[in-house]
Amino acid sequence: MSRCLALVPAAGGGSRMGADRPKQYLDLAGAPLLAHTLRRLLAEPRLARVLVVLAPDDVWFDRFDWPRDVRLEILRVGGATRAESVRNGLLHAGAAADDWVLVHDAARCCLPPDALDRLIDTLQADPVGGLLALPVADTLKRETSGQRVAQTVSREGLWLAQTPQMFRAGMLALALDRPLDRAVTDEASAIERLGLVPRLVTGDALNFKVTWPHDLVLARAVLGLDNAGK
């Protein structure tokens, strides 16, 4: 019987934060941002394993306390790109080809439990797999040089990709073993290069990615509301 496992690529530096450390280790409500991400995943009982892929020379991880759970595994096999980190993590995970792998951004620390449940419920019998995503709600503008509007782009049929992105381990390994160009920015786009069509599963606006300093403020507010409601 196939299992579900989560894989969190956490080998990046997060340079856009302008911080003194990789953003996954920034303090968020008294714990590293990554710790909140892992707690969200470990709260899902259907995840048999939660794998974190770190850079081989990571000097930050061991400085912090992490959730104590036998399902949590640390792999220091991260690569220069996200795709390399995910591929290396798959190679070292020893997962069966038909196991489901849920790749989740380290910086999406507010993943709502019902969104994760919805993803697994929707895709566990799907022939391809898919990802959490949200329909684009805002008007889109394409720019020219000098930040002038070149045109208004129709948002019809456009979605914002989120994570987790859920695919069979064998299929994902095959997709990531192929030469990839800059157009492949997530697992779903690699799967698309195989001629397959991932399914879009409605995500959640709270499942945002911490990218800029102001995102930390929003994440603190979301986590504070969650804690207040417990």
Swiss-Prot record:
The record marks 16, 23 as: Transition state stabilizer. It comes from the Bacteria. GO terms for biological process: isopentenyl diphosphate biosynthetic process, methylerythritol 4-phosphate pathway. It holds the Pfam family IspD. PROSITE patterns: ISPD. Pathway: Isoprenoid biosynthesis; isopentenyl diphosphate biosynthesis via DXP pathway; isopentenyl diphosphate from 1-deoxy-D-xylulose 5-phosphate: step 2/6. It catalyses: 2-C-methyl-D-erythritol 4-phosphate + CTP + H(+) = 4-CDP-2-C-methyl-D-erythritol + diphosphate. Its EC number is 2.7.7.60. One of its GO terms (molecular function) is 2-C-methyl-D-erythritol 4-phosphate cytidylyltransferase activity. SUPFAM superfamilies: Nucleotide-diphospho-sugar transferases. Catalyzes the formation of 4-diphosphocytidyl-2-C-methyl-D-erythritol from CTP and 2-C-methyl-D-erythritol 4-phosphate (MEP). HAMAP family: IspD. This is 2-C-methyl-D-erythritol 4-phosphate cytidylyltransferase. The gene is ispD.
